[in-house]
A protein has these predicted regions:
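Short, basic/aromatic recognition patches that contact phosphate-bearing ligands
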Residues: 1-90, 223, 274-297
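Short, compositionally biased low-complexity segments
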Residues: 33, 103-116, 229-238
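Conserved short hydrophobic interaction patches
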Residues: 61-64, 199, 263-267
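Short secondary-structure junctions
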Residues: 67-70, 200, 240-244
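A generic structural signal for beta-strand entry/edge sites
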Residues: 75-77, 146, 175, 247
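Bulky hydrophobic/aromatic content
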Residues: 80-152, 263, 270-280
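Core beta-strand-centered patch of the WYL/Sm-like small regulatory domain
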Residues: 116-225, 229-231
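Polybasic (Lys/Arg-rich)
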Residues: 216-297
Length: 297
């Protein structure tokens, strides 16, 4: 059983040697927890330090976490002891899995993982966003500007040209969009960034983004295990989603509620009657007006 030990932190600067060593001590503990062993060469290879510095780091770790590792002379590695206590990093499954998948989705240099089990991830089609489009939208948000865009809506057969006043961007789990005031429709709505075909002009904006009530307001979505599941299945779902007293409460912006519900197939009105989902949306009737408004725009 891992026991949490707190170490009094000293004031450090990001570029100072103390900060650098603390990062290396975290690395040592991470490798001990997940690989079960570590040697000086791993520190040298990962951080580009000398053998002497690696020895000092291991000695420092042993000083701060006595009993966490034992030296295996035959293999010339330090092995994690069965009674290892957490000092620098709390083991977290999601952190490990995020790092495991990092070579598939980004640079692996930030990952502390040593040995990697065989794995793969499902790669969904990505929405292609033009870099210049994203840059100009971000600049418009920063500088409080309106932008005139050519936009292809899925509600209209042809591309239209309109002014929008972006004030935020958001990711719904599948695609990125900008939250903006639409000067044509005269309300705040979402514009999929990949569907902005061109940005023509910019101008100073007079739109007050604080008036976007749906963006600035939050609601709590209450979920529970589907009552159609067996008792054993419900317990498994409650454990899987980390529910407390049989419920999972998710705080979310009103403007993102309908995306959340859609991704988890929680709307009873759209889920096939013969399909049993893992989760039920407890307070659907309370939040249904938000869904209705969002999907009508």
């Amino acid at each position: 059983m891992l026991a949490r030990q707190t170490i009094e932190a000293k004031q450090r600067t990001p570029t100072g040697a103390a900060w650098g060593q603390e990062r290396r001590l975290e690395f040592i503990e991470f490798r001990l927890l997940w690989d079960g062993k570590i040697n000086r060469g791993e520190l040298v290879d990962f951080f580009g330090i000398s053998i002497q510095q690696a020895s000092l780091d291991l000695a420092r770790y042993i000083e701060l976490a006595p009993g966490n590792l034992d030296y295996d002379r035959s293999s010339k590695v330090y092995r994690a002891s069965p009674s290892i206590r957490v000092v620098f990093t709390q083991p977290d499954a999601q952190t490990f899995l995020n790092q495991l998948s990092s070579p598939a989705v980004g640079p692996s240099a930030l990952s502390f993982i040593g040995w990697r089990p065989p794995f793969d991830i499902v790669r969904y089609p990505t929405r292609s966003i033009r870099p210049d489009t994203l840059m100009q939208v971000i600049w418009a948000i920063r500088d409080r500007q309106d932008v005139e865009v050519s936009y292809q809506s899925m509600r209209r057969p042809d591309m239209t040209r309109r002014w929008i006043s972006p004030h935020a961007i958001a990711f719904d789990g599948v695609r990125w969009h900008t939250r903006a005031w639409c000067h044509e429709n005269q309300y705040f709505k979402d514009f999929v960034l990949a569907r902005i075909q061109e940005i023509h002009r910019v101008r100073p904006s007079r739109i007050d983004a604080t008036q976007d009530a749906r963006w600035h307001s939050f609601v709590t979505i209450v979920l529970r295990a589907n009552r159609a599941l067996t008792r054993g299945q419900r317990i498994a779902v409650e454990t899987e989603f980390g529910m407390s007293e049989g419920e999972l409460r998710v705080r979310i912006r009103e403007s993102l509620v309908h995306y959340f519900i859609r991704q988890l197939s929680l709307d009873r009105d759209t889920v096939p009657s013969n399909k049993i989902e893992l989760l039920e949306w407890v307070n659907q009737s309370e939040l249904q007006p938000i869904i209705a408004e969002a999907t009508s725009r």
